Amino acid sequence: MGKLSTYNHKKVTCALGNHIVSGYADDSFITVEADGDGTTYVTGADGEIVRSIDPSSVYKLKLTLLQTSSTNAFLQKMYDKDQKSGTGTFSVNINDLLGSEKFSGGPAWVTKPAAWIRGKAQANREWEIVVSAGEFK
């Protein structure tokens, strides 16, 4: 018999400081992407190759939320606080409770407010957060 695995989006948790994210969009709602160059290389005229490993541990976190999510207000508050006093940073902890993947880092901050859209139906809001010293565990 083959191996059976289970994924349940309800078992993915995301904490921003002491705020628990809720009101996720109905499709992809968390994206974590390395912001550095990873490993680059240069090939010399004689064919010798030199690799350079980017020391950056900065990541970009994108959260896609429903228009009515209370997390929108939290992220806007943190952005406003950061713009006013430079103190709008927080830690990030993402955990897939059914899997073995975890991501954490910080300090983190909101780069700019999500687009504000209104129409016939609800519109998702996408927030971009920079996470310093991020790591997958």
Which sequence ranges carry the predicted segments?
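Generic recognition of well-ordered secondary-structure surfaces with a strong bias
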Residues: 63, 92-94, 129
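Short, acidic/charged, Gly/Pro-enriched secondary-structure junctions
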Residues: 75-104
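Solvent-exposed edge beta-strands and adjacent loop segments
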Residues: 2-67, 99-101, 107-122, 126, ...
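Residues on the solvent-exposed faces and adjacent turns
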Residues: 131-133
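Short, conserved turn/kink motifs that form compact alpha/beta structural patches or helix kinks used as
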Residues: 57-59, 64-83
